[in-house]
């Protein structure tokens, strides 16, 4: 479960979720509809849509670790660029669906 990943990294769930909600708000989503996913495979749920694969880092996690000095400065942004380059190439109609898991991950997790 994602909460276990956060515990291992010593990142309070509230810290992660509040950051995710702020990123959701900045991207034009209603932060009240964002919560931790109850599905073990995913990190977050937005209005019934699970997204963000558990077990992997994301911009929020890498930024927190960067702030703590556990990864070098610029690492979160470098990982963000890699994620965006690969995931914007995914085929399908996800670009036209703001609630697609890929769109949500790109805008909230990354």
Name every feature range the model reports, one short phrase each.
Residues 1-110:
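Arg/Lys-rich, low-complexity, intrinsically disordered basic segments
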């Amino acid at each position: 479960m994602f909460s276990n990943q956060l515990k291992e990294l010593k990142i309070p769930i509230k810290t992660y979720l509040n950051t995710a909600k702020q990123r959701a708000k900045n991207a034009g989503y209603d932060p009240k509809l964002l919560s931790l996913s109850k599905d073990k495979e995913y990190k977050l749920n937005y209005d019934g849509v699970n997204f963000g694969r558990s077990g992997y880092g994301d911009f929020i996690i890498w930024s927190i670790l960067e702030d703590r000095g556990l990864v070098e400065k610029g690492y979160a942004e470098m990982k963000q660029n890699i994620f965006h380059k690969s995931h914007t190439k995914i085929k399908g109609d996800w670009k036209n669906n703001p609630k697609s898991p890929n769109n949500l991950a790109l805008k909230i997790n990354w």
